[in-house]
A protein has these predicted regions:
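Membrane-embedded alpha-helical bundles of multi-pass transporters/translocases
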Residues: 5-345
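Short, Lys/Arg-enriched N-terminal segments with co-localized hydrophobic residues
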Residues: 1-3
Length: 345
């Protein structure tokens, strides 16, 4: 009878290892980094509108510019990793990088969507501002990826961190999309214009700033030098070491190629101009875009839960390979469909 009420042993008790654990409020606050990352992601999806409306850049040229900046993004990633290894201040490492990344992102987006937009500047200004945004985005994204292992290395607590991140990852874009398209867009005349872009970037800066502050509060208890110390003597990271690993590590090369191609595809597919052509021209109903985005959240959450269980049962490798094949098959079907139909009818 007592066994029924016996407390479940912790991972530390089972493994004999003293794990680091976070409180629930710390996990939730750290998940608030999505308030910056995902609102910015939604805003930058309208970069094609900003380029066309504010800088007079042709739609086709915008696609080339945004895709080409992915190459610049690939250059900034190792540089930021090099920077991350060397930042160590009395205010911590992670908090400094989070605030620094936010400031750079906010400045670039503010200039791009508001201050310098529709002021007579052209393609060069837009490209430089977009590159500045990429720098801030890289700093922020790379730092955010280190938050979960900093919060907890307890295997029993990892699912809790993942659940809260998933909740924010789905809810933030949904709410932000409603705010932009249902609330803000009608107030600005019902069309994507300069007033709408300016108001949108102001909202992102405010919400992103709040998210950054909350994240810094949540991680403050773990943002200490001892959290980053490795066992034994710590050797400084050098560019030579990074190049050596890149040249001789075949799995890493495949991983980089896979992620780079995925990122390019995601960047192109997420541009607002794609949605405009699909819903505005082919389907003829732009409001349907927002409705479908909200409706799609439920199956997305279901698939996220199913995917986590599938990977846990069959392993991450099989999960990625199997569902990548499924996604490729679906993509081929969509391509054949859009080639076969006549969008004028």
């Amino acid at each position: 009878e007592n066994r029924m009420f016996k407390k479940k042993p912790t991972a530390s008790e089972v493994d004999g290892v003293q794990y680091r654990r976070a409180k629930l409020w710390q996990i939730i606050l750290c998940a608030c980094n999505a308030l910056l990352g995902l609102t910015v992601y939604s805003l930058i999806g309208m970069a094609s509108y900003s380029a066309s409306i504010g800088y007079g850049v042709a739609t086709a040229a915008v696609g080339v510019i945004l895709t080409a900046t992915r190459i610049f993004d690939a250059v900034t990633d190792p540089l930021v990793a090099f920077l991350y290894d060397r930042v160590n201040t009395k205010f911590g490492k992670v908090r400094v990088l989070l605030v620094g990344g936010y400031v750079i992102e906010a400045l670039a987006l503010w200039l791009m969507f508001d201050v310098m937009s529709s002021k007579g500047f052209g393609v060069v200004t837009f490209t430089l501002l977009y590159m500045l945004y990429v720098v801030g985005m890289t700093i922020n994204n790379m730092t955010v990826q280190t938050l979960p292992p900093l919060l907890s290395n307890d295997p029993q607590q990892r699912p809790t961190i993942g659940v809260w991140n998933t909740i924010f990852n789905y809810c933030v874009p949904m709410v932000f999309s409603i705010v932009l398209n249902v609330v803000l867009l009608p107030l600005c005349g019902g069309t994507y214009n300069q007033l709408f872009l300016s108001k949108a970037v102001h909202i992102v800066m405010i919400v992103g700033g709040i998210g950054t502050i909350l994240t810094c509060i949540g991680i403050s208890g773990f943002d200490k030098p001892e959290s980053f110390e490795s066992i034994g003597k710590r050797e400084p990271l050098k560019f030579k070491d990074m190049l050596d690993v890149l040249q001789h590590n075949r799995p890493l090369q495949c991983y980089i190629a896979s992620n780079a191609s995925d990122k390019i595809a995601q960047q192109v597919a997420s541009q607002s101009i794609i949605g405009t052509m699909l819903f505005g021209i082919i389907i003829g109903n732009m409001s349907l875009s927002t409705l479908l985005s909200v409706v799609a959240m439920l199956p997305s959450i279901i698939f996220a839960v199913f995917g986590a269980k599938y990977a846990g049962k069959h392993g991450s490798k099989k999960g990625i390979v199997t569902w990548s094949a499924v996604c490729m098959a679906v993509a081929i079907i969509m391509i054949v469909y859009f080639v076969a139909i006549d969008p004028t009818k």
